[in-house]
Structures are given as structure tokens and as C-alpha cells.
């Protein structure tokens, strides 16, 4: 067919007959996929937590170019199981205890399927009213559960790193409104604790504050920020002609899950007119429990707070929420509307594109809406209480075992501990445990020492899994010593 003929052909490549075949193919494949997903969620423990692959194995196994002709769903599903699955680290595995769990619960998975089918893009209200308004409703529900003030406006981003970057950019906007046009001043200073997440420094790099202008506030023996030293550092920087503009307090640090004294940090922030951002990406969910709500004491005085439902609210990645009591400043920092996106203003229409860098927006709120409704507050509270109780029990086992020592408080369900030996011996122990495929742990460094981490929070984890994890660790300790890789008792 000539180009002219092709250009004049108004028949869709998917005519009605082909569309019917396409729909039937999809129906069969989707049913197979749902059956596979249900079986996987029920039997994830059949797989090794970590895949037994080497870097480059999957690249070498797959074709070097895409096919010229299309392939049937059956071939795609077959290759998924035979080639992709063996290279997967199973975050849904009950014994995935390396990082804060990102468990894909059934209601959220169903919601993700529906969101993908709708394929809506929530650029502004008109492009998808449901995206804009369900986000407001769902984040309002969660705000109530967390005990945050009603004036806190919520918006969804993908990860806490991005949420915090937007908060810090808003902080810069409050301190230096000219930065949007002229760029950052060189004397802006940001404060955060020695235990804060690396994304805070990355945010300073990304928005032009500079890594050298990030002050790491020392922590106490429980790895919590010291507000007295924060006050001293801010005073010194002001005296030196610098402009402190933001402080980040953490509720549930990544290494130890320590909780900074937010109320005391807020006092310093108010004294020096700093934007207070609270990183509650992990532990914020615990505030749903009445007995844990104190961890957010002082957060009502913050300018912004981030929490991640994809960490401990059984919502698959990615979904991070930024709450702020100054949405006007956040909007001022980012709103930039080209003519083709201008729509009629309405007081109840929220255009989410005005509150961040991304223009395109997935329907992320749908999966959180499904999760909150499916489990309910009481169901989520039961799960959180179980995880925290198991974490406390694991900590007690460590305390009772002479060969091990706990090196940090365990306020939630993450325990930091180490074998009473060298860093090399602890590293060897971790390598053996993870290579077994029975359990996946991670490590950190505290006070210059190599430390093991157990993070309990997976939806499928049982008390028996936690017990098994401890026995696996103890067993490999004995075995590693027997192989001569642990040298000291």
C-alpha cells in the first residue's frame, strides 16, 4: 500500500472483529493473571526471598531486540514465569524483613488493575474529577486517623523522597520568594539529624541549596535529634550571616526507627522562623493506634509532614502523602500553567498539577481508598499491634541471648542488633542468612559498628515466621562459626 493510500485509510487497525478477539484474548489472560496473583499471595513463601541470580543473568537470557511480530498473551505469561520471576526479590514474602515492608494487599492490587484499565491522568480537575476529588477524600480520612489538624492539605506523590523535596522547596519559597525566578541564595541552611534519610540531602542538592548547606544535628544515645544542639547551630549560623530556613524532624528513622522530639524541635523552628517538615514516612502509620499517637505530638505545629502508605499501610508501591498547612506556599512554589492547560477556576476544583513538578498523575488514591475501606481502622490497628508486639518479642530474644546484643531502642517493629564479634563476622552472618533464601535481612552502621536489622511489617508475616527468623539467625551463627568465618565468641 502506498503512503497516500495508507493516509486515506480510515479503518482502525482494530476493526470490530479484531476488537472482539482482542477483548476475548484479554479476558482469558486477565483471568489467568488473577488466578496466578491469588495463588502467589497465598503461597509466596514457596519462593526464596532473594533470587539466586547474578548481575546480568536476566539481561543475557532475554532477546537483544524486540519482536517484529506480536506474540500471544500465553507466550508473555509463560516467559514471565520462566524468565522474569526467577529474578524477582519477593517483597511480599512473609520473611522479607530487610526493609520497611511494601506489601501489596489484595484490595490494593484490585484497585491497581482498575486504575490501569481506566488509564486516567489527573493533570487538573477537568482531566479527571475522580482523581482529584477521591484524593482529597481519602487523604482526609487518613488525616483524621492520624490525628492531624483539619487544615492540613494532602497530596499524593510517588515516594517520600519526592514528597520531602517538595516540602523543602516550599520552605525555600517561604524564606526566599525570589528563588523561583532567580535561583537559590547561597546562604540558605537546612537542618536535619544525623539519622535522617538520605533523601533530605538529595533534596538540598536537587533544588540548589547544596549539600554543604545541610547541617547534621547530633543525636542522643537513643539516636534522636538533640533540640538543644539544633538551637545552638541555628544561632551560630544566624550570627555568621547565614539564613536558616528549614528543619526536618524524623518520626521513625530508617536505620533505627528512632523518633525525634517533634514538639521541642517545633519550639526551635518557631524561634528562628524555620519551616518544620516531619518525615514520618515509616512510623507515621503507627499513630493510627491510640497508644502510639503521642509519636506525632508537636506535628500539628509543623508546616508539612510526609507519610508512606506503601510502607506500613499495606498499599503497594508507590504512594507517598505530603500533608501541609501551607498549601498556598506549596502552590506558589510550583504552579506554572501553560495556555493549553488553562481551565475555568472553581473554588471546589483542585488542580493537582499546581502542587508539584509532575504534570501527569496516576490514580494512586484509588488503591488507598480500597485499602482503608477493606481493612477499616480496626483491621489496620490489629495488624499494626501484632507487628509491634512481635518486634518487642524479637528484641527480648536478642536481649536474652548472650551471643548477641541490641544496639538501639525498638519503639516499633524494627530491631537493630549484632553478634558480639567483629564487623566482618556480622557481615559474614548476614551473607549466609540472605544466601539461604529462607530470610532476607539488611544492615546499617551505628556508632561506627556494623549492625543487623530485622524489620517486621509484612501483611503475610505470622508469629511463626518471626520465631523462625530468630532460629535461622541463631542457626547460621553456629554454622558460620563452625566454618571458621566467625572467629571470636
Please state what every model-predicted region is.
Residues 159-331:
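Conserved PLP-enzyme active-site core in the AAT-like
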Residues 152, 402-405, 438-443:
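A short linear hydrophobic-aromatic micro-motif
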Residues 2-151, 431, 439, 450, ...:
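N-terminal entrance/gating region of PLP-dependent enzymes' catalytic architecture
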Residues 405-433:
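Conserved PLP-binding catalytic core of the aspartate aminotransferase-like
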Residues 12-22, 118-126, 149-155, 185-188, ...:
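Glycine- and acidic
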Residues 253, 272, 297-399:
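Active-site C-terminal subdomain of aminotransferase-like
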Residues 446-489:
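PLP-dependent enzyme catalytic core of the Aspartate aminotransferase-like
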Residues 409-414, 436-453:
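Conserved PLP cofactor-binding pocket of PLP-dependent enzymes
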